[in-house]
């Protein structure tokens, strides 16, 4: 169902710390112009962890209404409280978004059987297509390929965003899961290998500033134009690397502000901005790479 370049959209904020909805509108226009496949709202890159429940709902509703069916919208859910998740899903059921991305439960250290029943229980509360989000570094919880494959046979669980960095899992999940189960790369830097092994797309942080390049790269790989894909990948590889200079979303928010996509680089605590050395290194990379994305569209 979901393929190609899905942007993990940042959440722009004013200097006061309030949500900057005008900048969100500009970002949506930027992604429509540059052929982004879908928008993931309030994921890790969207600072889900620092937003109130009310803010999360307002942001998703605004993005959904602004997109006006021109581009699919997926909402991120990061929680370990299943009742809070049900409450959030109930809101998303009312606005009929295209998908929900749900992380594995953090901190609680569940067994694989516990993880299976967790996602199974959540799936009973909605018909919205559900994507599992595996990011063991962030959550301390790792869903194994065998568990993913079992979950793939639940009707509305349609894919996984995998940020485990273990590329050997891609073929295992693809082989044992139901047909057309969607494997989405969760780390930009691994996109080339991940998709060549059977992935259908990427949920991309970098796409916030290289929407055109990211969508082009996915299209080239899916069409098996591997030489052109590798050429494009290695042209933007340094950008993928520099985005790892500090915890996400600090680097990408700075870059969006530097390139004029958002008005401020404000980020909520406990995240903090880049230091002078990191900014110098980032500017050097941005000056080196010739971006084709239509940034002046907003």
Swiss-Prot record:
It catalyses: L-aspartate 4-semialdehyde + pyruvate = (2S,4S)-4-hydroxy-2,3,4,5-tetrahydrodipicolinate + H2O + H(+). One of its GO terms (cellular component) is cytosol. Pyruvate binds at residues 45, 203. It is an enzyme of class 4 (lyase). The record marks 44, 107 as: Part of a proton relay during catalysis. PROSITE patterns: DHDPS_1, DHDPS_2. The keyword Amino-acid biosynthesis applies. One of its GO terms (molecular function) is 4-hydroxy-tetrahydrodipicolinate synthase activity. SMART domains: DHDPS. One of its GO terms (biological process) is diaminopimelate biosynthetic process. It holds the Pfam family DHDPS. InterPro entries: Aldolase_TIM (IPR013785), DapA (IPR005263), DapA-like (IPR002220), Schiff_base-form_aldolases_AS (IPR020625), Schiff_base-form_aldolases_CS (IPR020624). Its EC number is 4.3.3.7. It is found in: Cytoplasm. Pathway: Amino-acid biosynthesis; L-lysine biosynthesis via DAP pathway; (S)-tetrahydrodipicolinate from L-aspartate: step 3/4. Keywords: Amino-acid biosynthesis, Cytoplasm, Diaminopimelate biosynthesis, Lyase, Lysine biosynthesis, Schiff base. Homotetramer; dimer of dimers. PANTHER family: 4-HYDROXY-2-OXOGLUTARATE ALDOLASE, MITOCHONDRIAL (PTHR12128:SF66), DIHYDRODIPICOLINATE SYNTHASE (PTHR12128). Belongs to the DapA family. This is 4-hydroxy-tetrahydrodipicolinate synthase. It comes from Wigglesworthia glossinidia brevipalpis. The lineage of its organism: Bacteria, Pseudomonadati, Pseudomonadota, Gammaproteobacteria, Enterobacterales.
């Amino acid at each position: 169902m979901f393929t190609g370049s899905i942007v993990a959209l940042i959440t722009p904020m004013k200097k006061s710390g309030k949500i900057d909805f005008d900048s969100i509108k500009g970002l949506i226009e930027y992604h429509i112009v540059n052929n982004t496949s879908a928008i993931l709202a309030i994921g890790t890159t969207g600072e889900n962890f620092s937003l109130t429940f009310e803010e999360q709902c307002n942001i998703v509703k605004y993005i959904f209404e602004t997109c006006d069916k021109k581009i699919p919208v997926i909402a991120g859910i990061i929680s370990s409280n299943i009742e809070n998740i049900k409450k959030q899903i109930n809101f998303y059921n009312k606005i009929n978004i295209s998908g929900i991305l749900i992380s594995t439960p953090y901190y609680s250290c569940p067994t694989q059987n516990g993880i299976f029943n967790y996602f199974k229980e959540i799936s009973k509360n909605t018909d919205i297509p559900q994507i599992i989000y595996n990011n063991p570094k962030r959550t301390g919880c790792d869903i194994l390929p065998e568990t993913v494959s079992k979950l793939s046979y639940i009707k509305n669980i349609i894919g996984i965003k995998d940020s485990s960095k273990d590329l050997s899992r891609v073929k295992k999940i693809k082989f044992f899961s139901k047909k057309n189960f969607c494997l989405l790369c969760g780390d930009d830097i691994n996109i080339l290998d991940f998709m060549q092994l059977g992935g259908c797309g990427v949920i991309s942080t970098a796409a916030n500033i290289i929407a055109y390049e990211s969508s082009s790269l996915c299209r080239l790989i899916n069409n098996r134009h591997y030489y052109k894909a590798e050429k494009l990948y290695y042209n933007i590889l340094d950008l993928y690397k520099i985005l790892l200079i500090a915890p996400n979303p600090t680097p990408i928010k700075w870059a969006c502000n530097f390139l004029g996509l958002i008005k401020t680089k404000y980020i909520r605590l406990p995240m903090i901005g880049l230091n002078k050395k990191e900014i110098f290194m980032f500017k050097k990379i941005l000056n080196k790479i010739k971006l084709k994305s239509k940034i002046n569209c907003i």
